[in-house]
Amino acid sequence: MDDTTYKPKNILITGAAGFIASHVANRLIRNYPDYKIVVLDKLDYCSDLKNLDPSFSSPNFKFVKGDIASDDLVNYLLITENIDTIMHFAAQTHVDNSFGNSFEFTKNNIYGTHVLLEACKVTGQIRRFIHVSTDEVYGETDEDAAVGNHEASQLLPTNPYSATKAGAEMLVMAYGRSYGLPVITTRGNNVYGPNQFPEKMIPKFILLAMSGKPLPIHGDGSNVRSYLYCEDVAEAFEVVLHKGEIGHVYNVGTKRERRVIDVARDICKLFGKDPESSIQFVENRPFNDQRYFLDDQKLKKLGWQERTNWEDGLKKTMDWYTQNPEWWGDVSGALLPHPRMLMMPGGRLSDGSSEKKDVSSNTVQTFTVVTPKNGDSGDKASLKFLIYGKTGWLGGLLGKLCEKQGITYEYGKGRLEDRASLVADIRSIKPTHVFNAAGLTGRPNVDWCESHKPETIRVNVAGTLTLADVCRENDLLMMNFATGCIFEYDATHPEGSGIGFKEEDKPNFFGSFYSKTKAMVEELLREFDNVCTLRVRMPISSDLNNPRNFITKISRYNKVVDIPNSMTVLDELLPISIEMAKRNLRGIWNFTNPGVVSHNEILEMYKNYIEPGFKWSNFTVEEQAKVIVAARSNNEMDGSKLSKEFPEMLSIKESLLKYVFEPNKRT
């Protein structure tokens, strides 16, 4: 190194268990034994400690699990480790996910960056802050542009992900100008190579080709991207670290462009597959920019150059994935043509460590994505469910379903309102997902809750929120079985209109204390991005002897109110809840079969299939109110969101016939 070269002493690398940053960290550890490297990573779904295996034995390496959004932790690390250089890679990066969870991108990419910058300002010891951004902040490049975006080009982001990265850049620039922080920004194009989580196209296509599955291309495949091999990118950051000028921006890219269709064809050729039969064109994404193109001259003037050609880089990448097929565990959710929010990798434990598996080097993982009808999806051995509600109806059925599907599960021993016991469960069981099927509905019915309000609050509100928060702290998805009995027909959703209540609608039924608590906790759970809320209504199963079964209930009543309602056939929808967990789906879902069925229609089916001599009589809602303590919810739920995700789901009447009445037919 010459006299003008910057030489750091103690480097903090954020997000270093992720793809690009792990290659950078491993390279610096390998090439500079006199540098102390501290890496900080919260270990989310696309990062893994195994990515840093080459560095763990080095005396100048230290790993810290934590979130850049924790200002206390960041300040503590800067001071105690005497950090003089930060290489900030940590970010949410998958564009598709940013459309369904943009607030999480804002939290990670903007707020997290702000925390780091403020810590740098307060400690006053940072000599270099290298902020890693993306070429997507420039926006879409004109198709006929002969010159790529240079570092002074206007920022015109087109999606939530790139908008958060551009926002973070503005903060970096402001802290550089306002407080004199020694900042450098990089903007990179697409990177590929070993260790990359298969939400990105190249590893996704390789894994699909390995398992003989079609390669899904959005639109016509004419979109153009530039690709750099990961080791070339790691070298670029090595150059920027030592030779980059404070206050400058550097594009990390290549002028060699490739159409998506050509990338898919090249991967097919590597596997000896016919591209025409192996490539499947699927519906395009509405936010799929046509082209990103960078000018790469500024970085080259520092002495960097691309070393790995496309053919060699792709071959190295393919070889790595075929030799490490289980690196990421169950990635079936990521391999879907249109994945929603991606799952936690199967090998991830709640404490951030990874399960070690003995996999021979020539093993090829077969990845399967099966619809809920088959009740089988992905690598079941990598899943482990923690279920609360062992003694309840839904909890018991979930356990039986896991046994049937070969999924490892355990019931939680802790009580929902006891935080310490929940933490102990997660530490000992180390689940990949948590299912909450616990709750107080009242025995024999919701009238019980009217005289047991403290107990109902303790479990339905305080307990559920406690479990959600413990899961959040451990980066776990919580599948929460809730209720749709928080709505009632009204002027905008009249009975018989076919207009159902949607997921975003706010509760309008508070006739029972049970419903009040469920409405309250649902509203609060909206603030937890790790929760999937399933609104169950009047649950039904093929077990007609179970007193919790809605059909069993009304068949034992002397009189029933004949009114149409949305309902949940558990035999069909409980397997869907497991599939939703595998797909890492979040937010609120109306968990009912499409359509409505009246109580008289159900009892007519019961008479035709089960008990020919069965008789019943009706009474009005007003007459019913005289013999019950709390009012009952009647409504229609809009099932379009769930139906779009699972188009094979049957309507309520079809599902009743297939799963309940046909199997129990006695006449």
Swiss-Prot record:
Active-site residues, record numbering mapped to chain: 135-136, 161
Record: residues binding substrate: 134
Keywords: Isomerase, Lyase, Multifunctional enzyme, NAD, NADP, Oxidoreductase
Pfam families: GDP_Man_Dehyd (PF16363), RmlD_sub_bind (PF04321)
Binding, NADP(+): 389-395
InterPro entries xref list: dTDP_Gluc_deHydtase, NAD(P)-bd_dom, NAD(P)-bd_dom_sf, RmlD-like-bd
Residues making up the signal peptide according to the UniProt record: none
Cofactors that this protein relies on: NAD(+); NADP(+)
GO biological process terms, semicolon-separated: mucilage biosynthetic process; seed coat development; UDP-rhamnose biosynthetic process
Species annotation: Arabidopsis thaliana (Mouse-ear cress)
Source lineage: Eukaryota, Viridiplantae, Streptophyta, Embryophyta, Tracheophyta
Catalytic activity: UDP-alpha-D-glucose = UDP-4-dehydro-6-deoxy-alpha-D-glucose + H2O
Other notes: In bacteria, TDP-L-rhamnose is formed by the successive action of three different enzymes on TDP-D-glucose. In plants, on the other hand, a single polypeptide probably catalyzes all three reactions that lead to the conversion of UDP-D-glucose to UDP-L-rhamnose.
pH dependence: Optimum pH is 7.5.
Annotated protein name in UniProt: Trifunctional UDP-glucose 4,6-dehydratase/UDP-4-keto-6-deoxy-D-glucose 3,5-epimerase/UDP-4-keto-L-rhamnose-reductase RHM2
Binding site for NAD(+): 15-21
